[in-house]
């Protein structure tokens, strides 16, 4: 009799594993995935070793917005994943002059970007970047420590994996949409 019981156990265990895989695999593949922050480029918003959940679904339904914190495949090596903040949107011109960033939108209006999330601007240079359709300009919040669009160019839309949806670790900083700002796009008009 004990043999029948162990066969039942293994059959039930196999069914459980199959059902769990059928539920978890599609979610992991199409909806959300884990991401561990590596480095100081997004400090103080995100610190090295923090554990995030990436929302992969939203950008299939809508376009990324300025100020969104995104995870993407590094254009120079698609096996590497980076985390940065969106500064410039498709067809815009991003102008950097020292610590000041201005955005010239597709309609010709220019705004000075307000960046309360940046603790260290570093020594900014003067440069201008014209974005094409489906290109984004991304930067780290800790500018001196960030390898971003200023260094390697614009980010193709197809490289974006998703946005930071939830910070899970450390436990004292758990939260949804960490690093998001609702007023980032309302920069001050430039005369």
How would you label these PLM feature ranges?
Residues 1-15, 26, 30-31, 35-36, ...:
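Soluble "head" domains of membrane/secretory-pathway proteins
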């Amino acid at each position: 009799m004990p043999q029948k019981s162990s066969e039942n156990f293994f059959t039930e265990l196999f069914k459980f594993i199959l059902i769990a895989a059928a539920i978890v695999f599609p979610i992991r593949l199409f909806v959300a995935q884990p991401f561990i922050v590596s480095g100081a480029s997004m400090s103080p918003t995100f610190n090295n070793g923090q554990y995030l959940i990436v929302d992969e679904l939203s950008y299939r339904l809508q376009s990324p917005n300025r100020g969104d914190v995104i995870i993407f495949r590094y254009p120079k090596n698609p096996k590497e994943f980076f985390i940065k903040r969106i500064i410039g949107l498709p067809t815009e011109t991003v102008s950097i002059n020292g610590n000041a960033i201005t955005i010239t939108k597709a309609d010709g209006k220019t705004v000075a970007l307000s960046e309360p999330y940046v603790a260290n601007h570093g020594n900014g240079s003067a440069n201008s970047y014209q974005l094409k359709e489906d290109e984004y300009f991304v930067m780290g919040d800790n500018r001196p420590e960030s390898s971003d669009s200023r260094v390697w160019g614009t980010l193709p839309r197809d490289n974006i994996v998703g946005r930071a949806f939830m910070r899970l670790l450390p436990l004292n900083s758990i939260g949804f949409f960490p690093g998001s700002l609702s007023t980032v796009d309302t920069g001050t008009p430039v005369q």
